[in-house]
């Protein structure tokens, strides 16, 4: 329940409850899943599904935004004993946009941690040292959706060389992280986060972007944007807030977020120089990195691959440079006629990231903003640089993923994945769509989901959602829900195509419910039970309608599934009759005579 905060979306899903699976390796690892109960008498067992919603859908949880979520990761950090508390930097007026903030600071203080001198505390460092962490065990159990781990495994091959095991183990997770093919984005200063993994040999993840409103009424309203996105399935959330209250808003979100939070630090750094890109400096940017690192940001988008020599390559593009971060850095480079300070200081960026185990999401500042510009010289020149920066980060045990396009027609999507795997050494790919056509403003969640499903099948590890408002305006709550669910569909379609373990179980369960006319089970097994039920009830709203063996589209006489039931029953009867004839034939063969002596009747004297 939510404590005196009605704005937060806290209700459980229908016919669902939160369950927790205990790790056999770590006593303090309990992994949340959502259990969907099915109709009594259906013969169906409850179905466990991956759950991103955190405590907000657990009816036993007490949600108090002023206290934040439980710090489930604190005990793991304490046992490893390789981090230390230290005095954090003081909050400055420019951190909140040089305004008096109507959103108060988060009052519950906690120690700010960093790596002890000489200690390598990233998940990649542990993985390379052969150490299985609690976080690795956590994500293995989570990816299995509660399925018991077996000793013997078979491996399912996926497109472009991926290998997916039948059952995930902590050792498999460790090996993927050690080789840079997967990341667990989890800042040591975000202990409230439930560990998750991003990599092409795991289920495809999705990210939702949120940002502060022009007029902010309360901190609960800002936190609820995050809660709403994760309710519908966002695996990570990027806070792209600009303007006023940035620091305080971010603190409230992180303290109450069970999923990794990403940012583009360049946006806040730009606010600190009143939006004048030419006035940006490395010192301002570095200070912003540390500010956000201490708050607990789990991954930074860094546009370090956009270099001065690449800018002229965009001159003949239809849409030029469409990345906000890319355009900021391009303007800075041209004004100073210098190499990007992000590129020049990338080593120190990695040092900061490794101190807090922050993952780097290497931004695609030169991504194509139209299908005409897809796969051009500028895009792939930057991608090659991102591959070089990946190796630099790996040398410092920093976890890395690579951001990708953008706008790409279907026949050019596979090349993007092939180039990324080759140039970026199989680091996880994180793409915005891609949008497969430019003719559908208002429907770009659909144009992009087509590309997202394809590139997810080919190996993209995480998809950044697109809402119906893309290119048009700021998305509202309904747009966020539509975008998240659309991308859950794309990610799930990719998981099915990759042959991911358990991916089809939910499809099969819903198909059986559909064929059996178990309407409530159909609703409850869907990604959006509320909408499924509402659409059904528009024409058949009564409770009795949930028991009938037809819907309003076909009616009782023309329902194909009802007819299929009749056909099945008739076939079963015919089979039974056929079996009776076979039995008679066998009896004849035994006796060898077509004539059978009739039983003698006793004659009754009259």
UniProtKB/Swiss-Prot annotation:
InterPro entries in the cross-refs: ThiC, ThiC-associated_dom, ThiC/Bza_core_dom, ThiC/BzaA/B
Residues that hold substrate according to the record: 209, 238, 267, 303, 323-325, 364-367, 403, 430
A UniProt-annotated Pfam family: ThiC_Rad_SAM
Reactions catalysed according to its record: 5-amino-1-(5-phospho-beta-D-ribosyl)imidazole + S-adenosyl-L-methionine = 4-amino-2-methyl-5-(phosphooxymethyl)pyrimidine + CO + 5'-deoxyadenosine + formate + L-methionine + 3 H(+)
Cellular component GO terms held in the UniProt record: cytosol
UniProt pathway annotation: Cofactor biosynthesis; thiamine diphosphate biosynthesis
GO biological process terms, semicolon-separated: thiamine biosynthetic process; thiamine diphosphate biosynthetic process
Assembly and binders: Homodimer.
Family recorded in the similarity comment: Belongs to the ThiC family.
NCBIfam families in the record: PRK09284.1 (NF006763), PRK13352.1 (NF009895), thiC (TIGR00190)
The protein's name in its UniProt record: Phosphomethylpyrimidine synthase
Native organism: Bartonella tribocorum (strain CIP 105476 / IBS 506)
Lineage: Bacteria, Pseudomonadati, Pseudomonadota, Alphaproteobacteria, Hyphomicrobiales
